[in-house]
Amino acid sequence: MKIFAHLSWLYATTIIFISLTLVILTYWLLPRPYARKISAWFVRLSIFFSTDIQGVEDPAAQMYLINHQSDLDIGIMETISKKDLSWVAKKELFDVPFFGLVMSMPEDIPIERQSKTSLLKLLKNSKDRLNKGRVITMFPEGTRSRNFKMLPFKNGAKVVADKYQLKVQPIVLMQTAKYYDIKRFYYKPGRIKVIFMDSFIADKSDEKWLSNLRIKMQKVYDDELSNNLSHR
């Protein structure tokens, strides 16, 4: 059984790399965001995962905050949202050959965790993308979480949302690492639950709204885990 899961992971990973090549080859031929959307759908259809959506995507949302467990997470969001998403990711990923090109071409936003000027650059780049009608999309944990518990949220999301008084929509992805886990070389097809929570306007007078949001998202995750046998 493990051998089959490893072979499935190899197949899925190959498909993902092909999809990244597809982004590069089609980016200048298609209006944004279609190169990335087509690439994401190519992955979704080729590796046979589907989604079960709860709640409604807010058409007026300007920022998405999403929990992060798997490399599938970006592809999931790109297939369920028609919006032009601008992903915020650590700068080191932009420096990786090939993969960095896939992120820099669509004008995703790099962030340097140790840089004193990083937040200023983040604010400037975010404003530029918002002016282009794009949605700032972040994994506020900063990296993949494990063991069903979300990591503390980084403050960058709050800085941007507060500065521009953005309408924020939290989104909970359920157990995506159960289906694709690069550390275990594991993949299995499945139906992934996506929960759109209620959106809100960022209130900079509330210093704890981001940490409180993590608690709310964790509760949504825990409740879904407890009430839905398919997650076990």
Regions flagged by a language model, labelled:
Residues 55-59, 186-187:
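A short beta-turn/loop motif at secondary-structure boundaries
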Residues 1-52, 101-102:
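A transmembrane-helix-recognition feature enriched in membrane-embedded lipid enzymes
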